[in-house]
């Protein structure tokens, strides 16, 4: 795996093989980040089920200020922490090992134009 854009472009990301999981393919990352690239710069990112951190690292490479990485796999988070160290992004990374989340709450505003303001709020 590798970083596909931003200032870390071309840098390797350590992978981890575990049954039932697979890394996000480069073309999927390219499509995903192409659609949200205008919101990444100076943003704070939450990478749930982060694994080795491919998506959060990509966001940091593209200019995000901070990324919260959350996963329940203690072993895989060792690889994430190695990636964070190897890429020198520890100051922008917060890693949490959580066995479970009871709820994830998000209240979408009634006025959908407000979503744009929230996404671009600094």
Feature-to-residue mapping (PLM):
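Class I S-adenosyl-L-methionine-dependent methyltransferase catalytic core
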Residues: 1-122
């Amino acid at each position: 795996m590798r970083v596909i854009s931003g200032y870390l472009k071309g840098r390797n990301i350590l992978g981890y093989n575990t049954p039932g999981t697979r890394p996000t393919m480069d073309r999927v990352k390219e499509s995903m980040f192409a659609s949200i690239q205008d919101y990444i710069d100076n943003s704070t990112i939450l990478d749930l089920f982060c694994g080795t951190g491919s998506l959060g690292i990509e966001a940091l490479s593209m200019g995000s200020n901070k990324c919260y990485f959350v996963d329940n796999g203690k072993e895989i988070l060792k690889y994430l922490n190695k990636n964070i160290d190897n890429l020198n992004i520890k100051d922008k990374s917060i890693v949490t090992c959580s066995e479970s989340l009871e709820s994830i709450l998000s209240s979408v505003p009634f006025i959908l134009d407000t979503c744009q303001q929230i996404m671009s709020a600094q």
